[in-house]
């Protein structure tokens, strides 16, 4: 079934298995309750080219705990059983997909309730076969678009499925105090060519940034800031008597990011 989403979109990112698989399920439930429209579930990888230090540390913790691509996909199935209903996008690098087998990957993802796939190290120009395979299984391949040439932006935006993930600046993920001055022009150019909602990520970490972007995009992806919060709460999240309170604190933080998005878009 096609991924159908409507702005404004609050799209949080967490890493599967950080700090433990059962905690990831609780965090996903908390994010949905806090207003998430889509969940990006990151699959830990040993050589994450697009990820900054915060997400690299989270990936290392999850890998140390035994998380793999098949286990991450199965974790989505567990989330569905526990009541997570929002769309879930599987964020994975290409090599684990290749090792599992492309068709097996899509079949397992569909079987466990995934709604789409994002592969950050797969160039758009080489994504055609995987995009077609995803269409066969009803799982759109979400495109990343960075501030590059207008011709390339047009090609990527016009072929986008589900929603379009705009990278706010070149480089790796991570919390940023400020966003590039040219971001607005870039997002306007993307929206000119896109038939699907346009979300922006890489560095979005504060309500003020969310409010700033309301006129030029349809949603925001927040990753490093939330993963950093998980890192801070990890000892309590792994302590049975403290987990409920820690999850509630995480949810409150997520809500503080989602609420300004709703307010900003309601005033458009």
Curated annotation (Swiss-Prot):
* UniProt-listed SUPFAM superfamilies: Ribulose-phoshate binding barrel
**Lineage: superkingdom:** Bacteria
Q: What is its EC number?
A: 4.2.1.20
Which NCBIfam families did the record assign?
trpA
Q: Which family does it belong to?
A: Belongs to the TrpA family.
Catalytic activity annotation: (1S,2R)-1-C-(indol-3-yl)glycerol 3-phosphate + L-serine = D-glyceraldehyde 3-phosphate + L-tryptophan + H2O
**How is this protein named in the record?**
Tryptophan synthase alpha chain
Q: Its annotated pathway? A: Amino-acid biosynthesis; L-tryptophan biosynthesis; L-tryptophan from chorismate: step 5/5
PANTHER family given in the database record:
TRYPTOPHAN SYNTHASE ALPHA CHAIN, CHLOROPLASTIC, TRYPTOPHAN SYNTHASE, ALPHA CHAIN
**What does UniProt list as catalytic?**
40, 51
Pfam families given in the database record: Trp_syntA
- GO MF terms, alphabetically ordered: tryptophan synthase activity
Q: Which key words are in the record?
A: Amino-acid biosynthesis, Aromatic amino acid biosynthesis, Lyase, Tryptophan biosynthesis
Broadest EC class? lyase
Subunit structure, as described in the record? Tetramer of two alpha and two beta chains.
- Function, please? The alpha subunit is responsible for the aldol cleavage of indoleglycerol phosphate to indole and glyceraldehyde 3-phosphate.
InterPro entries membership: Aldolase_TIM, RibuloseP-bd_barrel, Trp_synthase_alpha_AS, Trp_synthase_suA
Q: Name one GO cellular component term.
A: cytosol
Gene name as annotated: trpA
């Amino acid at each position: 079934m096609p991924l159908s989403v409507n702005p404004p979109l609050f799209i949080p990112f967490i890493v599967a298995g950080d700090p433990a698989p059962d905690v990831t399920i609780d965090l996903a439930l908390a994010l949905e309750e806090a207003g998430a429209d889509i969940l990006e579930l990151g699959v830990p990888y040993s050589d994450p080219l697009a990820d900054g230090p915060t997400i690299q540390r989270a990936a290392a913790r999850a890998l140390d705990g035994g998380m793999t691509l098949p286990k991450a996909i199965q974790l989505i199935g567990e989330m569905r059983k526990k009541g997570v209903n929002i769309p879930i996008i599987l964020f994975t690098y290409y090599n684990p997909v290749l090792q599992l087998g492309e068709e097996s990957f899509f079949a397992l993802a569909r079987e466990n309730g995934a709604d789409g796939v994002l592969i950050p190290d797969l160039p758009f120009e080489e994504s055609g076969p995987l995009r077609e395979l995803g269409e066969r299984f009803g799982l759109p391949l979400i495109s990343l678009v960075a501030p590059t040439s207008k011709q390339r932006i047009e090609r990527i935006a016009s072929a986008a499925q589900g929603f379009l993930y705009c990278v706010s600046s070149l480089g790796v993920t991570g919390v940023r105090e400020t966003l590039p001055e040219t971001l607005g022009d870039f997002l306007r150019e993307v929206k000119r060519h896109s038939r699907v909602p346009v979300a922006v990520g890489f560095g979005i970490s504060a309500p003020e940034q969310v409010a700033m972007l309301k006129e030029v995009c349809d949603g925001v992806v927040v990753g490093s800031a939330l993963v950093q919060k998980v890192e801070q709460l990890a000892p309590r999240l792994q302590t049975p008597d403290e987990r409920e309170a820690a999850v509630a604190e995480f949810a409150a933080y997520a809500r503080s990011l989602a609420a300004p998005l709703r307010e900003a878009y309601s005033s458009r």
